[in-house]
Amino acid sequence: MENTSVNKEPSIIVGGFVLGGAMIGAGMFSLPTIMSGAWFINSLFILFIVCFFMFHSGIYILECISKYGAGTNYFDISKELLPKWACYIANASLIFVLYILIYAYISAAGSIIYEASLLYGINFNLRAIFFIFTIALGATIWWGGACASRLTSIFLFIKIVLFILAFSGLFFKAKGDLLFSATFAGKSQLYLYPFIFIIIPYAITSFGYHGNVCSLYKLYNQNERKVVKSCIIGCLLALVIYLLWMIGTMGNLPREQFITIIQKGGNLDAFIDSLYTVLNSKYIEGFLLWFSISAVFCSFLGVAIGLFDYILASLKFKDNKTGRLKSGVLCFTPPLLLCLFFPNGFLIAIAYAGTAACVWAIICPAVMALKARQKFPNSGFKVWGGKKLIYAVIAFGVVGIICQSWRNLIYCLFIVK
């Protein structure tokens, strides 16, 4: 077990990598597919906007917990700073997002590990993969937060190396006429603008690190500046990786091919199979496969650490073997069971996670920051930007919720024939 008496603060790079691991993962595989309507330039513009607002909503959570000290979690601050009904909605949204993301990553892990087993001539049972994957990585989180954080950093480093090895060829082969195409299936750019709104729920999920803010605040011994720097590193790292990812995929796969991926359910294996068609090297195919596996591992660990700590603190379990085991059972059993019965829900889960994240990760932190400034007008850390930025963040969260409804309508009108 982790020695809790050791209070040495890790580097901000470790914190940035933990947040990057939570953001950069299996969810990024949904981006090129869901961006195939709006395409490269429009999608890049949306990513910058979403990154800006998600960064600030995350440090609003930091501002609120800094008023109450280490060991405080999202439930505690929402109970103190929100009306009772809003507190229940916020925490229900948080729990829903974290659970459904863990479900999505178990689903993605199963499909990609199954694909890898077939590549090497082994035929594993898909549901057995779900079970082994969850138990193995869940055990590292049970062992201790520092252990899981370091493992996440290792997987993220491996993922970046494999990303470079797998996609360096794709970057050089990227075609400008594909990236900057202004038409699709003979339709004008004006026809494509509604697809911009589809991107926002997925992009919100792709910059979701908020469940880890409380854990980082505890990890850095209430050092707000280190947490903010870690958030900056994590968000910028995610933004750069997503940009390179978009160039490597959209510059090589025709837009029409993404429709085929969507029709196959948008799962990770369908997207990987499409990329195989433009790769001419078995080595690069192997790098791509292992990159996908490391991406799923990173995302799972990053999100699961947040939910595990939330359950541990909210239910007042002791931070020992027994207490952490109880937290682990409650954290991993529901998404594992859901995956056993509904194994192919990756793309749908990512979208609905983004919608619920608008409530707990964007709107509620901004509202709580307003309340905290009224309650503690002269104390401690305060996010820059004043009330105008807070109101802008709230408005962005409302737009994100509306976009999920638009996504369903737009797909019915433009994708489903």
UniProtKB/Swiss-Prot annotation:
**Any one GO CC term of the record:** plasma membrane
Q: Which GO terms describe its molecular function?
A: aromatic amino acid transmembrane transporter activity
According to its UniProt entry, the protein's GO biological process terms are:
amino acid transmembrane transport; L-tryptophan catabolic process
Q: Name one Pfam family in it.
A: Trp_Tyr_perm
**Could you confirm whether the keyword Secreted appears in this record?**
no
Topology versus the membrane: Multi-pass membrane protein
**Origin, by domain of life?**
Bacteria
Cite the entry's keywords alphabetically: Amino-acid transport, Cell inner membrane, Cell membrane, Membrane, Transmembrane, Transmembrane helix, Transport, Tryptophan catabolism
Main location group: membrane
User: In which compartments does the protein localize?
Assistant: Cell inner membrane
Q: Which InterPro entries match?
A: Amino_acid_transport_2, Trp/try_permease_CS, Trp_tyr_transpt
Instruction: Read off the NCBIfam families from this record.
Output: araaP
Described function: Involved in tryptophan transport across the cytoplasmic membrane. Plays a role in transporting tryptophan which is to be used catabolically.
The protein's name in its UniProt record:
Low affinity tryptophan permease
Q: Please report the organism this UniProt entry assigns to the protein.
A: Proteus vulgaris
